[in-house]
């Protein structure tokens, strides 16, 4: 279906709903709309979607961890942030 026919069908459905929800009057309006065509094609499914999701998630976590590790070692090496050796567990 093209976007034009989808819009037309949606608009016809909206008009039917709006007209049917109005209180009835003596004159009355009879408007009917029928959608042309039947069932469309089956939608596209991605067969390797879960595999791609796992690959992207794992690689992103690995690269993020690597960047964090390199950043922390840089900060400690240049003495910008050095964790204290005090034991607060006493």
Swiss-Prot record:
Parts of the chain that traverse the membrane: 49-68
Gene: emre-1
Subcellular location: Mitochondrion inner membrane
Role played: Essential regulatory subunit of the mitochondrial calcium uniporter (mcu-1) channel, a protein that mediates calcium uptake into mitochondria.
Keywords, in A-Z order: Calcium, Calcium transport, Ion transport, Membrane, Mitochondrion, Mitochondrion inner membrane, Transit peptide, Transmembrane, Transmembrane helix, Transport
Organism: Caenorhabditis elegans
GO cellular component, one term: mitochondrion
Annotated family: Belongs to the SMDT1/EMRE family.
InterPro entries according to UniProt: MCU_reg (IPR018782)
One Pfam family this sequence matches: DDDD
Protein name (Swiss-Prot/TrEMBL): Essential MCU regulator, mitochondrial
Membrane topology per record: Single-pass membrane protein
GO biological process: one example: mitochondrial calcium ion transmembrane transport
């Amino acid at each position: 279906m093209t976007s034009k026919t989808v819009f037309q069908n949606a608009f016809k459905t909206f008009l039917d709903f709006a007209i049917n929800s109005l209180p009835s009057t003596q004159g009355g309006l009879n408007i009917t709309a029928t959608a042309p065509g039947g069932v469309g094609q089956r939608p596209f499914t991605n067969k390797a979607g879960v595999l791609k999701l796992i690959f992207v998630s794992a690689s992103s976590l690995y690269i993020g961890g690597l960047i964090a590790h390199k950043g922390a070692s840089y900060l400690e090496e240049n003495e910008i942030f050095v964790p204290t050796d005090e034991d607060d567990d006493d």
